[in-house]
Amino acid sequence: MTTDIEQTRTDGTTVRDVTYELLRAHGLTTIFGNVGSTEETFLAGFPADFRYVLGLQEASVMAMADGYAQATRRPALVNLHTGAGLGNAMGNLLTAFQNKTPLIVTAGQQTREMLLLEPWLTNVDATMLPRPWVKWAYEPVRAQDVPAAFMRAIATATQPPAGPVFLSLPLDDWGQPCAGPAVVRTVATRVAPDPEQLREFAEVIRHASDPVLIYGAAIARGNGWQQAVALAEALNAPVWAAPSSERAPFPEDHPLYVGGLPFAMGPLSDKLAGHDVALVVGAPVFRYYPYVAGPYLPSGLRLLHISDDPAETGRAPVGDSLVGDAVLSLAGLTDLLASHTPPPAKPHARLPHRMAPHPAMAANGSPDGLLSAAQVFAALNQVRPDHAVLVEESPSNLPDLHTAWPVTEPDTFYTFASGGLGWDLPAAVGIALAERDSGRNRPVIAVIGDGSFQYSVQSIWTAARLRLPMLIVVVQNDEYAILKSFAMLEQAPGVPGLDIPGLDIVSIARGYGCDAARVADLDAFKQAAAAAWTKEVPTVLEIPISAQVPPLV
């Protein structure tokens, strides 16, 4: 469907006018950005019905937009400062791409009149800089092409697999006369699976004696918990979360949920031993991290794979793949298997955590007298509000966190798909803003390591300025514990730069306008955490924990 924004134009209409009308028509009235000289002509005369969310550094800007887009299930608009700003944002652009978040990323470009001379702040080869972490990158040839370029960017970002796109926009384009009204289009955002291949998958599952389901983040992105549960119950089959899943695809208190698969070949294969058919839905096959030798699959297991991302189906090393929407595929398989009588459920060892690289520690004190991560997270679970949203970036403590806090409601857990630190804190700010904008107003809690906290710390200034009453729990072990675990696995002793003593989290947080405190005992921690929701600004709680180096797998 296409509609003209208006049928006639009066003299004086500019590229800026038409572009803002296009953005308005798509509901893209919130812009996450960090202002630079090459963007000022776009932002001049900023419309009253638009909102500019300022971040102090572009990595924070990118991840705030990512969190906001995920939590609203809508694309978000990012405005960066030429090549320098895009460079600052690249780590979180990589994460947004792997999160499959629809972002329209724009950056200003020097004036066309001088581009050949490469003056200061020229983004040389602008469309190459963000690759390969965007679906499409473009610099319009004419100023009058800018609105149409935005329309293509929106369509490309939102079609599956969703992801970021990039536009480089010369600063002198915005005041140019517009060639005509912008055209607003809609595009489908789901791809139905091939019916014949889906029937073939159903027949394989129907004849399985011990099937197993492996669910991934695409189910959560597609709001598909209901469909995921329906298929699992129809098959009476155990459900694993795919390795390192960035969203929770299934209720972790469901009797059929058995935990998160490890993210190494050998251990993952061992977990699937004894099954004859595995169905992977909405995840790659598989997301690995450390190399631990072993087969991709145990002997006798046939793997079926469903993803809306042809890159995932293409690179899968084993199995038969089908390209299609995860949630539509789940519903279709449930219908096809409606008359199926599943085999009796077999006992499966249930793990007390999900997507964790190693077993959880015991929830008791540590030899050095400090609290353990398990104790802190158990206390947090006791005082967290109902329906709280957890945003996590403390990789070495992940199993302890999920032991204490199983994810039992949809859209209440977020983390990164990339493994690159610096996403959680600003993403939590974007999610908290989305919670307020949507009217859900669920409390947002970020759990983050003291090392991770440093990467995009500027984002807490934005949270304070927006008066978002979120809770940020910083567990302080004065080290990069996950890297020590990796070094231990790789038999690489003596690696420098893994200890980070002397960080004053409280002073940093207060300097950015947050309420902050250092708490060293559980009673004080629980009291301060409960009080966070009475504040008008974010609360940052620094809590020392024992420095422990758990095994990686």
Predicted feature locations:
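N-terminal alpha/beta PP-like core and its mobile active-site loop of ThDP/TPP-dependent enzymes
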Residues: 2-340, 386, 441, 462, ...
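Phosphate/pyrophosphate-binding active-site segments
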Residues: 2-14, 144, 180-182, 300-394, ...
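Active-site diphosphate/adenylate-binding microenvironment
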Residues: 15-29, 34-38, 42-44, 351-439
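A generic structural signal for residues located within well-ordered alpha-helices
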Residues: 60, 125, 223, 372-375, ...
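Well-ordered beta-strand positions enriched in small/hydrophobic/aromatic, beta-favoring residues
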Residues: 76-78, 167, 390, 413, ...
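Thiamine diphosphate
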Residues: 106, 114-122, 263, 269, ...
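Active-site flanking residues adjacent to catalytic metal/cofactor-binding acidic residues
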Residues: 281, 306-307, 392, 449-450, ...
